[in-house]
């Protein structure tokens, strides 16, 4: 009996020690706990980052030139092309529609031209809708882990709106926000999923009852998508009247830059390092530590940052 009680006391003490460790940012080891503690001081960990490539589309034959010829072609948001890297095929998508530069007549035949390079993101384009019920306490959680939060687009449609509705913009602080601002915030929750948060009527527009929320985003493989090239077209177009258009010829895709800059979700050591520093900086760039934290948020793909103040030079250069 004494051995059993001693063992029970040991187990309870061990569990209590683990619980206490998970209560502090420095000692926590479970990702959900680290993310939750960082959230308390306003830090949102970096999501997965999709590898991006730059491509050009060749001229697209839209048929004989006449009065009914489309004014433009629109490359629809979603899958655009597939590329290969190390014998693996990757899907590349765009989060927003891209409109052709012009439709040009060449010898009685019209061709849609996309003059500007198009940036494509490695991953699968997905969409999720929610209906607002103000009588319930709702949470708008995106079920898919592994999203690139920079590709997240949120639209809110009220009863009076048509189509997807109004495009809300994502923010990371409440500076210059009023009660009419159409904004949302995104925060990581359990299992590397993201939750969308809206305004309360004081900071940001409050959602109306029975509004429809549409979230569109790209789920990516992160770093493994780097290096993909040899793209082949898989996208779809719409004409100026909104109808689907299927090219009669193969759409030529020219690679401008291979896929690069893909990265995995921010790891625990990075969260523990930058969360308190960004909190102390409060988005102000005054001390070297402030710059170190803020630069990482502006350029999230930065591997390392070294900041030296002028006062540390020999001779010192104050104010630099």
Positions of predicted regions on the chain:
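Signature of Asx- and small-polar-rich beta-strand/turn repeats characteristic
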Residues: 1-320
């Amino acid at each position: 009996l004494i051995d059993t009680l001693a063992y029970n006391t040991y187990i309870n003490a061990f569990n209590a020690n683990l619980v206490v460790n998970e209560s502090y940012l420095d000692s926590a080891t479970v990702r959900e706990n680290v993310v939750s503690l960082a959230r308390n001081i306003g830090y949102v960990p970096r999501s997965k980052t999709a590898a991006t490539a730059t491509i050009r589309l060749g001229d697209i034959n839209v048929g004989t030139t006449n009065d009914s010829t489309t004014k433009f072609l629109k490359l629809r948001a979603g899958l655009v092309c597939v590329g290969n890297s190390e014998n693996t095929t990757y899907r590349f998508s765009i989060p927003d529609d891209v409109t052709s530069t012009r439709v040009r007549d060449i010898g009685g035949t019209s061709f849609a031209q996309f003059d500007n390079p198009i940036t494509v993101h490695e991953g699968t384009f997905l969409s999720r809708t929610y209906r607002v019920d103000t009588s319930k306490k709702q949470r708008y959680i995106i079920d898919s882990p592994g999203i690139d939060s920079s590709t997240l687009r949120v639209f809110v449609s009220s009863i009076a709106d048509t189509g997807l509705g109004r495009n809300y913009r994502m923010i990371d602080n409440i500076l210059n926000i009023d009660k009419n601002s159409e904004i949302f915030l995104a925060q990581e929750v359990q299992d590397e999923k993201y939750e969308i948060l809206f305004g309360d009527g004081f900071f940001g527009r409050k959602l109306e009852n029975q509004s429809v929320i549409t979230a569109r985003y790209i789920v990516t493989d992160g770093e493994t998508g780097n290096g993909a090239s040899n793209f082949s077209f898989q996208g779809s177009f719409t004409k100026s009247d909104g109808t689907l258009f299927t090219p009669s010829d193969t759409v030529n895709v020219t690679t401008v830059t291979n896929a690069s800059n893909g990265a995995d979700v921010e790891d625990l050591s990075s969260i523990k390092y930058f969360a308190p520093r960004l909190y102390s900086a409060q988005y102000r760039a005054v001390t070297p530590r402030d710059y170190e934290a803020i630069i990482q948020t502006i350029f999230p793909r930065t591997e390392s940052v070294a900041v030296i103040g002028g006062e540390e030079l020999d001779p010192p250069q104050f104010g630099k």
